[in-house]
Amino acid sequence: MKISFAGLGKMGAPIAMNLAKGGDELTVFDINESNLAKFSGLKNVKTTGNTDDICEAGVIFLCLPNGDIVKKTALGPNGLISKMKKGAVLADLSTISWKAAMDVAEGCAETGIEFMDCPISGMEARAIAGTLTVMCGGKEETFRRIEPLLKMIGTNILYMGKNGAGQLTKLINQLLFDINAAAIAEVVPMAALMGLDPEKTASVMNSGTGRSYASEFFLPRALEGNFSEGYAMKNAYKDLVSAAEISASQSIPMPVLAAATATYQQALRSGYGELGKGAMIKVFEKLLGTEFRKG
């Protein structure tokens, strides 16, 4: 089978590497030459900076930064769906809004292309290990076609339903993570201000009922003053906006989402958009005049 992969960034590159191990003919695309260089000389792998070269594949994977880029790549003038073979599969691993996924699905349906929204959950280490969670939306028969490929990149592969179901599932999961991160940012500077030992407090939080993936990831890094790791705050904020759009359109009250969004907005206004979500802690540290760090 011919496979193509577009988008060789922090997540895309290790995912494509795992697909390359499967032995199928793989063509990888990126606009960045240095990203392509990682794949130069690999058996059964071709590299290209021209999207025309990836359109002969039966399955094309996308792993791109945002919905606007996905839509431009797939639907724009000279976009992929205008050049792909009828019946081929466009599988989008990117995290984009539910609305953007539905727009791409509609465009694909009009041109005879099978679309699957397949957002991934798990950070770079899991992408490298091939242990991602993949949530898939589209026709079940299309899912079955690409399921063997998805098993090369993840260990928890879930068919969630029709187009859009993958992105919606990812959003629900991501919201809980995002909200947890905002809650942590609010409480740990309070602990420091009130005289609690930060290391002991973090130990209690990560062994007690307050434990979460967010606390396990962000608290050790906060103690070291490391706020650069993890999903960029500006990208996480887009998840909150997507959820707010669904909340408004479906009349779903989400007061906790609204409160968390305000914390993200404060952090973005403070210039922390390129940092990880843990940098929200710095907002409240500055407000309270304290730091949650190792002694």
Predicted regions: what is each one?
Residues 96-174, 178:
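Rossmann-fold dinucleotide-binding core
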Residues 269-295:
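NAD(P)-dependent dehydrogenase/reductase Rossmann-like domain
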Residues 1-62, 88, 124:
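NAD(P)+-binding Rossmann beta1-loop-alpha1 motif at the extreme N-terminus of oxidoreductases
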Residues 31-32, 66, 139:
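Residues in the short beta-alpha loop(s) of Rossmann-like NAD(P)-binding domains
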Residues 163, 167, 211-276:
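Interdomain hinge/lid region at the active-site interface
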Residues 129-137, 158, 162-194, 205-217, ...:
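Active-site-proximal catalytic alpha-helix in oxidoreductases
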Residues 52-53, 59-62, 67-132:
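Rossmann-like NAD(P)(H) cofactor-binding subdomain of soluble oxidoreductases
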